[in-house]
Amino acid sequence: MNMHEPLTGLFHSSRLMILNFADIPADTPPVENLQRFFEDCEKRGLNPRLPENRQKFNNHLLERSRVRYLVSRYGEDRKGMLTGSKIASQGRTLHMGVDIFCRDLETVYAPCDAAIVRTGREPGDQGYGYYVVLKPDNLPGIHFFFGQLSKDLPGVGPIKAGQPIARLGDFIHGENGGWSRHLHLQMVKTIPREPDPPAL
């Protein structure tokens, strides 16, 4: 099943850019090319993995591109980008969801009628931070995982399409796991026991 099929209204009328980090031309300016951004930061003695530096990169690309969202591709191999991170040490470099990057701490809405079946937090840096798991009413055996949220999470129970779930978490104090501002969205079939996060 295509992840976007049950989410037909999620990106409707939104201004977005689909990112494929591996295909960004090598001769684009450093601020628009993630690999060259990393190299340029390191030359200047800056840490490109700090979320505040990544957020500056995202904000500039959003402004230059005149879009509201940057959306990563499903199934990306991010080994190069995650070298030395906790995620890489756990073998979690293949990105099994989509990331939706933005400038502000936007509200996340339920894409369909569903039940909130679990909320939680993956502690530490370079994790999912606060998260919510939805069980859609019309998709048996499927759950939606929303990660990188704020600490103000909803309670478990039913939710209608279009109702707010939470807001995006900030990188300040590691609320969202220590990343630039974005939503991690993933479909999962099984939910492991706590405290393991239900996504990869």
Model-derived segments and spans:
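A residue-level detector for short acidic-glycine micro-motifs
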Residues: 102, 118, 148-151, 170, ...
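Polar/charged, compositionally biased leader and regulatory segments
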Residues: 1-99
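Small beta-barrel nucleic-acid-binding modules, principally OB-folds
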Residues: 91-92, 96-100, 145, 189, ...
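Zn2+-dependent peptidoglycan hydrolase active-site motif and core
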Residues: 110-150
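Short, glycine/small-residue-enriched coil/turn segments at secondary-structure junctions
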Residues: 88-124
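Short, well-structured beta-strand-loop connectors
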Residues: 107-118, 155-169
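Extracellular structured ligand-interaction cores
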Residues: 95-97, 105, 129-131, 143, ...
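Acidic, glycine-rich catalytic/binding loops that coordinate metals and/or anionic ligands
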Residues: 2-41, 157-173, 178-200
